[in-house]
A protein has these predicted regions:
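N-terminal, cleavable Sec-dependent signal peptides of secreted/periplasmic/extracellular proteins
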Residues: 1-375
Length: 375
């Protein structure tokens, strides 16, 4: 992946490739990868009898037990799926190109998905090859006592449908499939993963309260599972307090307001720090507030404020961003200032983000009007 740009710049040639794969173009490289995967999976019946644990010394284990990939067939089949689902090996589309419709059985129950025989002559389609692999894996694990591998594949083919299908009903069918899966397999940790994906879709639709409720169900069901932790993180993102401020660059009578955009907060704290504009102008390392790094922010936070105060904010029960206008502080002497905001009273860096903007207090202001781009 790091050297992808090198391969993209190469022109496809008709001559046979040399032994050094670093000189190949992308189509040739992908063709060779697929060739090796197909050759490996040709021995499927043998691979199905080889426990993946036999190769522990060679494989980098993930965060799930071997029951999710119990055999070398599972390992190689999922490697092939990762290849087909990457989208990198897409070639020029033929007239008979396979298109995955959202109203196809890709989101139907498992029995309908297994019975599905896509009507397509596009044998080169990566999506078509992936569908067949999902079906083969589901058939292989259909009678397993441990349902982990079977359930994992069933959930993955739904995610595959979400990523590659088209149609207005895609999200609705995907959500329905995830809900059906989570309810039918509520006694297995994988159901928390399904709830996480369902909550993610609902969140993307702007229904944050509903998304949090679904994610909380997944977290409480299996808190230490992969899906449980994903749900925990999603809830944390939805509940995360945020605040951003902006104001006029020049404060004079009548005083402007501080525009506060926030969520999951009921109070915001302000500090005003005075600075020497001449010194800052001659210091090449000085940057505008939007581009300050943590070190520069820390220096500001540690300075004694000219004034500090707080303002109450209406609660955001729906977790969406709200906006309030807070009156600017009166009584400041003419000069240059930084305005800092925080949702922690002590302006600490832990679980907090300090926002900074700059302004002047002056009786004068310069208004520039552009006329047809001439200034």
């Amino acid at each position: 992946q790091a050297n992808r740009y090198r391969f993209l710049q190469r022109t496809q040639t008709a001559s046979a490739p040399g032994k050094d794969f670093q000189t190949w173009d992308l189509p040739r490289l992908f063709a060779e990868i697929e060739k090796q995967l197909v050759m490996a999976l040709a021995s499927a019946e043998t691979l199905k009898k080889i426990p993946v644990s036999d190769f522990d010394a060679l494989l980098v284990k993930g965060n799930v037990p071997d029951s999710y990939r119990p055999t070398m067939y599972d390992f190689l089949a999922h490697e092939a799926l990762a290849f087909y689902n990457s989208g990198e090996q897409a070639a020029a589309r033929s007239q008979a190109a396979f298109d995955l419709s959202a109203d196809s059985p890709v989101f139907s129950d498992t029995a309908q998905f297994l019975a599905w025989k896509p009507d397509s002559k596009d044998d080169a389609s990566p999506q078509l090859k992936a569908i067949r692999l999902y079906q083969q894996l589901l058939g292989f694990h259909a009678k397993d006592d441990d349902r982990s591998a079977w359930l994992d594949v069933d959930l993955l083919r739904m995610n595959f449908g979400k990523n590659f299908s088209f149609g207005e009903e895609k999200d609705a069918r995907y959500k329905a499939a995830l809900k059906r899966f989570a309810e039918a397999h509520a006694d297995h940790p994988i159901s928390s993963r399904a709830l996480y994906h369902q909550a993610t879709v609902v969140r993307g639709e702007g229904e944050l309260v509903a998304a949090r409720k679904i994610a909380l169900q997944g977290k409480n069901r299996f808190p230490n599972s992969v899906g449980g932790r994903q749900c925990h993180n999603l809830i944390a993102e939805i509940e995360a307090p945020t605040v951003n401020i902006s104001t006029e660059r020049v404060w004079n009578d009548p005083l402007p307001v501080i525009d506060v955009r926030y969520r999951n907060l009921t109070k915001v704290y302000f500090r005003v720090i005075q600075y020497d504009w001449k010194q800052r102008l001659t210091n090449r390392g000085s940057r505008r507030p939007d581009y300050m790094d943590n070190k520069e922010r820390r220096v500001l936070i540690n300075q004694k404020p000219v004034v500090e105060w707080s303002a109450d904010l209406p609660a955001t029960a729906d977790y969406h961003e709200a906006r309030q206008e807070i009156p600017a502080r009166a009584g400041l002497k003419p000069g240059s200032y930084f305005l800092l905001s925080s949702h922690n009273e002590d302006f600490s860096e832990q679980n907090n983000r300090v926002h900074v903007c700059d302004f002047w207090v002056s009786d004068l202001a310069l208004v520039i009007r552009n006329r047809n781009g001439q200034g």
